[in-house]
Amino acid sequence: MKIMIVWRTVPGKYRPALEAFLRAGGPVPPGAKTIGRWHVPGSIFGWHLVEGDLTAVAQHVGEWADLLECEVYPVIEDDEAATAAKKLFAK
């Protein structure tokens, strides 16, 4: 399963969040794999696309909870969305 984590730094925690990222790099726990991570330069926002099980994603989000506010969304690719849409119109 692919999961998009949308994050922003907690108010007042920008520097500690950046220091933690520079120190460790934000690795995900076993059971998850980073597909990509994007940052808005000079801002507090970013996205992290992860593939894996929800337990590992929950652990990862929890590891950053004191520094980042996260929204977690399951995401699918175009072919999967098209398959679902075709089933809707087949009714």
Protein language model features and the residues they cover:
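Conserved, structured core segments of small domains
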Residues: 1-91
